[in-house]
UniProtKB/Swiss-Prot annotation:
<feature type="disulfide bond">
    <location>
        <begin position="89"/>
        <end position="110"/>
    </location>
</feature>
<dbReference type="GO" id="GO:0090729">
    <property type="term" value="F:toxin activity"/>
</dbReference>
<keyword id="KW-0165">Cleavage on pair of basic residues</keyword>
<keyword id="KW-0872">Ion channel impairing toxin</keyword>
<keyword id="KW-0732">Signal</keyword>
<dbReference type="GO" id="GO:0005576">
    <property type="term" value="C:extracellular region"/>
</dbReference>
<protein>
    <recommendedName>
        <fullName>U16-barytoxin-Tl1b</fullName>
    </recommendedName>
</protein>
<keyword id="KW-0964">Secreted</keyword>
<feature type="propeptide">
    <location>
        <begin position="21"/>
        <end position="74"/>
    </location>
</feature>
<dbReference type="InterPro" id="IPR012627">
    <property type="entry name" value="Toxin_22"/>
</dbReference>
<keyword id="KW-0800">Toxin</keyword>
<comment type="similarity">
    <text>Belongs to the neurotoxin 14 (magi-1) family. 06 (ICK-Trit) subfamily.</text>
</comment>
<keyword id="KW-1015">Disulfide bond</keyword>
<feature type="signal peptide">
    <location>
        <begin position="1"/>
        <end position="20"/>
    </location>
</feature>
<feature type="disulfide bond">
    <location>
        <begin position="82"/>
        <end position="95"/>
    </location>
</feature>
<keyword id="KW-0960">Knottin</keyword>
<comment type="function">
    <text>Ion channel inhibitor.</text>
</comment>
Amino acid sequence: MKTIIVFLSLLVLATKFGDAKEGVNQKQKKEVTQNEFREEYLNEMAAMSLVQQLEAIERALFENEAGRNSRQKRCNGENVPCGPNHSTCCSGLSCEETFGYGWWYASPYCVKPSKG
């Protein structure tokens, strides 16, 4: 019986002082959440600023590339069909009718020019 009274009194004291600290805990929770949201907001703003800077750099690079037309035209390598319907042969190769391919596929091929 004495132990039950002791436990009940502890329960009442814990409840009373727990409620007293609950207001303080709520204030602390509000401060923590406000700080977290503020930090998240600042981090988000920094990330957005970084994204905008990267987009500006990318836009400038693509404008320069489009303006100067820096992409090389593709060319055909050795033993690749060439002619009016195909792209041109790479440097060092010429578009010729060859015995090995031309008679079978009926189109000229890019080959190394013959020395002679």
